[in-house]
């Protein structure tokens, strides 16, 4: 009986991990889409980010800055320097997607 319980628990944990990975992949895809075109103005207009093929020259080069997701989210919500706030034009989910995308791809080596 105990072996069946452990097997069931392992299967459930595996399924949850699979769903989490699929959700992250969907968020990454949405984040890249927003970075390139959907945000107004698009992040790629100002920022350089190799994964996105973006060569903006106004804002920081994100591959060099390597911000974590919290830093990206804070900049999107509050604005920073010449960068405006996107709080009124982007949903929390979209801010989270861009934050995840930028933080993951800028830190990938």
What is each of the regions a protein language model found here?
Residues 35-36, 44-80, 88:
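Gly/Gly-Pro-rich "capping" loops immediately C-terminal to redox-active cysteine motifs
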Residues 8, 25, 30, 56, ...:
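Extracytoplasmic copper-binding redox domains, predominantly the cupredoxin/blue-copper superfamily
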Residues 1-25, 107-109:
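N-terminal export/targeting leaders of redox proteins
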Residues 18-38, 71:
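Electrostatic cytochrome c docking/interface patches
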Residues 41:
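Cys/His-enriched microdomains
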Residues 89-109:
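C-terminal capping alpha-helices of c-type cytochrome domains
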């Amino acid at each position: 009986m105990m072996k069946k319980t452990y097997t069931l628990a392992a299967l459930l944990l595996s399924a949850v991990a699979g769903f989490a990975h699929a959700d992250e992949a969907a968020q990454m895809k949405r984040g890249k889409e927003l970075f390139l075109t959907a945000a107004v103005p698009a992040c790629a207009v100002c920022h350089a980010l190799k994964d996105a093929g973006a060569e903006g020259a106004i804002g920081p080069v994100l591959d060099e800055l390597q911000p974590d997701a919290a830093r990206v989210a804070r900049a999107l919500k509050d604005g920073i320097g010449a960068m405006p706030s996107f709080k009124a034009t982007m949903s929390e989910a979209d801010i989270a997607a861009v934050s995840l995308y930028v933080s993951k791809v800028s830190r990938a080596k």
